[in-house]
Every structure is written in structure tokens, then in C-alpha cells.
Swiss-Prot record:
One of its GO terms (cellular component) is extracellular region. InterPro entries: Antimicrobial_frog_1 (IPR012520). Keywords: Amphibian defense peptide, Antibiotic, Antimicrobial, Cytolysis, Disulfide bond, Fungicide, Hemolysis, Secreted. Belongs to the frog skin active peptide (FSAP) family. Brevinin subfamily. It comes from Rana boylii (Foothill yellow-legged frog). This is Brevinin-1BYc. Expressed by the skin glands.
Amino acid sequence: FLPILASLAATLGPKLLCLITKKC
């Protein structure tokens, strides 16, 4: 697992959840 992908998932994951659940 690439560190770059890990960092991307860590930064984009919460944002995607925020947009999907509309709980920002």
C-alpha cells in the first residue's frame, strides 16, 4: 500500500463522508 494513497484516503475520506452524510 503506497503512502501517497494512504494520505489521500486519510484526507479525502472524511470529506467524502461529510458530503455524503451532509454532517459537516
